[in-house]
Regions:
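Membrane-water interface regions at transmembrane-helix termini and the short interhelical loops
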Residues: 27-31, 57, 96, 100-108, ...
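Membrane-interface loop-to-helix entry segments
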Residues: 115-157, 168-169, 206-213, 308-320, ...
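Juxtamembrane transmembrane-helix boundary signature
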Residues: 42-74, 81-87, 381-386
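Extracellular loop-to-transmembrane helix junctions
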Residues: 27-57, 78, 213-215, 368, ...
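C-terminal membrane-solvent junction of multi-pass transporters and transport-like membrane proteins
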Residues: 3, 169, 320-389
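Transmembrane alpha-helical segments of multi-pass small-molecule transport proteins
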Residues: 12-17, 82-87, 108-131, 144-154, ...
Length: 389
């Protein structure tokens, strides 16, 4: 298979970062104010991207897909649980991204949300048909256009002479805000190895991918937060219309949705291959896009906060177990059917995350939950009998 360059990987993750979902999530930070909100965004991304980096390095070192690396900690059958949960997550993300994109574009060109769902879905299928290693010039042109247009959007929001608009109350605590910032890179964590494994220089590609994604994602969050604070407007499409962006707004909204959602659908196909060797990744990715498009047409998906927290509770303890096994204990359970010990530790981590959601910590829930999970892995290893579980 043709290998991807470090530059190509950077472009892929630039496209992932330029996302309407990130901008919309950023608007929720407005009650904190610019300084406190930016601190929460930065801290959350440092935590989330550190985990994303370690997940990518595992895939890069081993040459395995994201869900195949999970089997190194949870065994062949144990890994299937996370492959299944990841496919569900990615179907959900595909639907949410298409819904958000269609809703936003519909605010500019009102020809019906379902029409824009179909247009965006069709473009994603074109991206899938071309394939991740052959996007080449398409990606370069698209990313250049998105970069220029997001700069224009920044100018409209931050340099149009608008005074700060008063935001009532502080409905979001700092800890909850940090967690919302962690959630985006965390949601990409079960995907990154699907791309780093095909890189010419896996370690270099992983670092570049994470740094590019982290920087761009922070930028999108700040655009959303700034839009709410400086314009008092939470609908990014309305801001674009008021700024007279017109066709430029259409390009930003449609192609940012396509370049991000393509990765969701593509990785859903790769994860499905971990579930069954009979499944074809590309065909499954197209099927996921069709399902996501249908769901976006049929169901409302305006509040994704609960979905983001659910992703955190599933995948934070999962990667914590992987980090402990790969980087500290040097333990590989790929050959076993299921690693009961690690599955129990993951379940404890999952429950702990849900309980931590009721506690407001300055660093959110993910970091304490991961520390707890890693400590449990180390204690379990120390306490194990001579014969391994």
């Amino acid at each position: 298979m043709k290998k991807t360059s470090t530059f190509q990987n950077g472009l892929i993750w630039f496209g992932a970062g330029v996302s309407l979902a990130e901008i919309l999530t950023g608007t929720a930070f407005a009650p904190l104010g610019m300084a406190k909100g930016f601190a929460a965004i930065l801290l959350g991304h440092i935590i989330g991207c550190a985990m994303m980096l370690l997940a990518g390095l595992i895939g890069g070192r081993t040459g395995r897909s994201a869900m195949e690396t999970v089997k190194m900690s949870f065994g062949q059958k144990g890994g299937l649980l996370f492959a299944f949960l990841n496919v569900l997550q990615l179907v959900g993300w595909t639907a949410i991204m298409i819904y958000d994109g269609a809703l936003a574009v519909g605010g500019i060109f009102a020809i019906g949300r379902w029409v824009w769902c179909l247009v965006i879905g069709a473009l994603i299928i074109v991206w899938i048909a071309v394939g991740v290693t052959d996007l080449g010039w398409i990606n370069k042109i698209t990313m250049a256009a998105l970069f220029i247009l997001t700069l224009v959007l920044c100018k409209v929001i931050f340099f149009s002479g608008n005074a700060m608009v008063g935001i009532d109350g502080e409905s979001l605590t700092f800890g909850a805000a940090v967690e919302l910032a962690v959630a985006m890179p965390l949601s990409w964590l079960p995907l990154i190895s699907d791309y780093t494994r095909d890189a010419e220089k896996p370690t270099q590609a992983t670092w570049v991918s994470v740094l590019v994604y982290g920087a761009v994602s922070c930028w999108m969050y700040v655009i959303g937060m700034g839009a709410a604070i400086f314009t008092g407007e939470y609908d990014i499409a309305v801001i674009m219309v008021k700024a007279g962006l017109g066709i430029a707004a259409l390009i930003i909204l449609v192609f940012s949705t396509v370049t991000t959602t393509f990765l969701d659908a593509w990785s859903a196909g790769i994860s499905a291959e971990s579930l069954s060797a009979k499944l074809n990744g590309k065909k499954t990715a197209i099927a996921v896009t069709v399902i996501g498009t249908a769901a976006a047409i049929l169901f409302p998906m305006d509040d994704i906060t609960g979905f983001l927290y659910l992703i955190g509770s599933v995948f934070a303890p999962m990667i914590a177990v992987q980090i402990a096994d790969h980087f500290i204990l040097h333990r590989d359970r790929f050959a076993v059917t299921a690693d009961a010990r690690n599955l129990v530790i993951w379940l404890v981590g999952f429950i702990a995350y849900r309980l931590l959601m009721g506690v407001d910590t300055p660093v959110g829930y993910t970091l304490p939950d991961m520390v707890l999970t890693v400590v449990l892995c180390l204690l379990a290893e120390k306490a194990k009998p001579t014969k391994q579980m």
